[in-house]
Design a protein with these regions (language model features):
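Substrate-gating cap/lid region and adjacent catalytic-acid/histidine neighborhood
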Residues: 28, 66, 73-237, 246, ...
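Acidic glycine-/aspartate-rich tracts in secreted/extracellular proteins
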Residues: 8, 253-256
Length: 312
């Protein structure tokens, strides 16, 4: 079977690829807008137990049995921060950080198709440049300077768009890049990379002032929403039809290519091997690499600090 997910579903696919418990249960993977490649996105068993204890206290319960007895509406309506619910390096489902497992080649080496969208961060809004800059509190100053050079905030309008680009590159662009490049280095199976940049006045979550496809907009293209209104959305319908054909081909054969479609080569860093969906399908180099390169250096710094702190 081919596993397939978007956003949180894509992150789940990434965990399945990295988990020794899931090896052999699927033959290919499609991941759209999500992966747990950052060292900051997972916790150890000890940290998880501490967070779990805090979670129980917030809900004013005293045992797992009491938590299990709660109905879903009561649980989700409590205002509890579920962002602490993150992958756990427990020695079973995950034996190490996902990035490290990919470095070591300890993952399901199956064909993968990875995609994210050009305006993923359009679901995030800030009002002022000061709000944007405040989010960098705690970062080393050299990284703050580099961030502001690439994602400027001289005006509120600049900051409005910069925060969206940071969200896109940090949460979606870099994880896809890290996954693709690491699997190319340590794996043997094909890696296909894609980028949805089609702009439309229809969206799933985002508000106005968008520059391309926002987070979750890819769902509309794959479920055929635009095909039902092709006269009103001709460009979107064209992209939708192309994407559907590629996705079905990959699910069937582990290769997206097929009759009547532009040839989609396997991913090669620094070459035009990323399939961009924008008024059709064309090949480009990895997009947004200036920002992604900065994030890659920062993630190296984070891994180094964590290793030194743990005595590794």
């Amino acid at each position: 079977m081919t596993i397939f997910g978007e956003s949180a579903g894509a992150m789940n696919c990434n965990i399945l690829c990295a988990s020794p418990m899931a090896k052999g249960l699927f033959r290919a993977c499609i991941s759209q807008s999500g992966a747990f490649m950052s060292s900051m996105s997972m916790v150890t068993q000890q940290q998880a137990e501490m967070l779990g204890s805090m979670f129980v206290q917030q809900l004013q319960k005293s045992s797992i049995e009491e938590l299990r007895a709660m109905d879903a509406k009561s649980l989700t309506g409590t205002g509890v921060n579920f962002m602490a619910c993150t992958p756990i390096i427990d020695g079973k489902v995950l034996t190490d950080e996902v990035y490290r497992l990919y470095e070591l080649g300890q993952y399901a080496d199956v064909p993968v198709m990875l995609m994210y969208n050009s305006d993923e961060g359009a679901v995030v809004e800030i009002e002022t440049a000061e709000q944007y800059k405040a989010q960098m509190n705690g970062l080393p100053q050299n990284y703050v300077d580099s961030v502001l050079a690439i994602y400027p905030a001289d005006t509120d309008e600049q900051a409005y768009y910069s925060v969206r680009d940071v969200v896109r590159d940090l949460n979606f662009g870099w994880p896809a890049y890290a996954w693709a490049t690491l699997q190319k280095k340590t794996g043997k199976s094909a890696v296909y990379s894609a980028y949805l940049a089609q702009k439309s006045d229809r969206t799933v979550y985002a508000k106005g002032n968008r520059r391309g496809a926002a987070h979750a907009d890819d769902i509309m293209y794959l479920n055929g929403s635009f095909l039902k209104e092709a006269e009103r959305y001709p460009q979107e319908a064209t992209v939708s039809e192309i994407m559907q054909q590629y996705w079905v081909n990959f699910a069937k054969t582990m290769n997206p290519n097929g009759a009547g479609l532009p040839e989609w080569p396997v991913y090669e860093e620094g070459k035009k091997t990323v399939m961009q969906f924008n008024n059709g399908a064309t090949l480009i180099e990895t997009p947004n690499m200036v920002g992604i390169s900065l994030i890659d250096r920062f993630m190296q710094y984070v891994r180094k600090v964590k290793a030194e702190a743990s005595g590794q």
